[in-house]
Amino acid sequence: MTSFQAVSFALGCNTLVACYAFTVLEKRSLMTSCTNALSFLFFLLTLRRIHRHWYKPYGAFLLIFVLTLRWFRGPIAWVVVDVVFASCNVVFFSPALSDENWPYVSFFGVVVVIAVHIIVVTHIGAFTACCLLKRVSLKSSEEKKKKKKKKKEKSLHTEREKKKKKF
């Protein structure tokens, strides 16, 4: 595998993992965490073909990934995870991407990965946040309408009772 193919592979896989993570951002069930972990493990197994010692940096990252999922919620947690994920590529791809013609290809590859991650994180995170805010605003407006209806019904009911008492 050439250095360009390795960078492309890392970029594609990492971005897919980031996208998948954001699609299940608000579902906080155990099943979701398990599917995230399984998809990440599958990703690790595919990376094993590139480098023999894949488990060293990514084993540590998997721990960080799981702990972040456990203790933090929301887009900020995914930004942290994604930056750590991209940073792990420095350790992982440095030996795999060292090229005599261009020794800094791993550095530039990692910079590209981090840049794409930040773009993906911000865009998908912003889109998710907008969707969630719309949902929340729609729910709150519906709740306000329901409360107003209840108040009107109560006031009408009390007015009827007052009229009955007068007669």
From Swiss-Prot:
It comes from the Eukaryota. It holds the Pfam family TMEM62_C. Partially overlaps YKR041W. It comes from Saccharomyces cerevisiae (strain ATCC 204508 / S288c) (Baker's yeast). InterPro entries: TMEM62_C. Residues 145-154 have a biased composition (Basic residues). This is Putative uncharacterized protein YKR040C. The lineage of its organism: Eukaryota, Fungi, Dikarya, Ascomycota, Saccharomycotina. Residues 140-167 are annotated as: Disordered.
